[in-house]
Amino acid sequence: MAGPKRFNKDKRPKRNTQSLLFKRKRFCRFTAAGVEEIDYKDIDTLRDFVAENGKIIPARLTGTRAIFQRQINTAVKRARFLAMLPYSDQHRSL
């Protein structure tokens, strides 16, 4: 009967120290532009925050502040409901 396995520090994957040092600074484009509210009728802006498959891109990838991310979510959902934005771009052709 074997005893419990011990944790070996040498076998753990090494992190890239350079990527930790040169991290890109997060910046919210709405704060920089002085935008107070995001409008669902501004389709060109909303398309930047929707992926090719139709999903809303998360704030950790876009760098958007939480208050603006919530406004983006509601604006995209309203634009989809009014058929200004597609729910998905991957439609099958019959």
Swiss-Prot record:
Single GO molecular function: structural constituent of ribosome
Cellular component terms per the entry's GO annotation: cytosolic small ribosomal subunit
The keyword Transmembrane appears for this protein: no
InterPro entries found in the cross-reference section: Ribosomal_bS18, Ribosomal_bS18_sf
Keyword terms of this UniProt record: Ribonucleoprotein, Ribosomal protein, RNA-binding, rRNA-binding
GO terms (BP aspect): translation
Spans through the membrane: none
Pfam families on file: Ribosomal_S18 (PF01084)
Disulfide feature: none
Function: Binds as a heterodimer with protein bS6 to the central domain of the 16S rRNA, where it helps stabilize the platform of the 30S subunit.
Family (UniProt): Belongs to the bacterial ribosomal protein bS18 family.
Complex and partners: Part of the 30S ribosomal subunit. Forms a tight heterodimer with protein bS6.
Protein name: Small ribosomal subunit protein bS18
Organism for this UniProt entry: Polaromonas sp. (strain JS666 / ATCC BAA-500)
